[in-house]
Amino acid sequence: MRIYSATDVGQKRKMNQDYVFVSEGPVGNLPNLFTVADGMGGHNAGDYASSHAVRILVDEIREDADYNPVKVIRHAIEAANTEIRNRAQEDENLRGMGTTMVVATIVDQYAYVANVGDSRLYVIQDGIRQVTRDHSLVQEMVRMGEISEAEARNHPDKNIITRALGAEKTVDVDFFDLKLEKGCTILMCSDGLSNMVEDEKIQEIISDPEADIDQKGSALLREANQNGGKDNIA
């Protein structure tokens, strides 16, 4: 397994509210752990929400005695949701904060994926496939047939999400499991990448046979910034 991770503040924001956690080795009973979180909130609340939620997630996973990856991740996300919501209610400077979160662990030949919000997980191999489903207003409109995927990319409400950690007392988490084929690439990212770079361009960069994993990752960040870098990128 070869891994690249990075965050970038982008071209328009002063603060980076994206947060990434990567462990190729065990975290608790999980053999590895990969997480992207995209925080939201005024002042430094979004930065706090994403980083604190991931810290809670990792701590909970380390303490969990269960071996079922779905149960372990679900419990950890629920704990992070409760903590973020409680902190937002206790501290007026953090009021209204929240964060997206996409989490993955690879067990044998299977990836177990959890998602809240509009951060994404893709699989790239002979094409590109978005595994997660965005919890966003425009995606709901697409599902209902009100707008097309092309219209969704430039819709004025495309940044409005319908689920986030810290938004409600309980959090609704989507889970996916997929069998991984040899040679496939998994990409986890915030909307600062997926809103700035078309899926086809992502596939082109990832599939470049001349580039190594670090060069591909750097190329994705560079492409997002060259296209406007309107948000933080992870």
List the predicted regions and their residue ranges.
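PP2C/PPM-type serine/threonine phosphatase catalytic domain
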Residues: 1-234
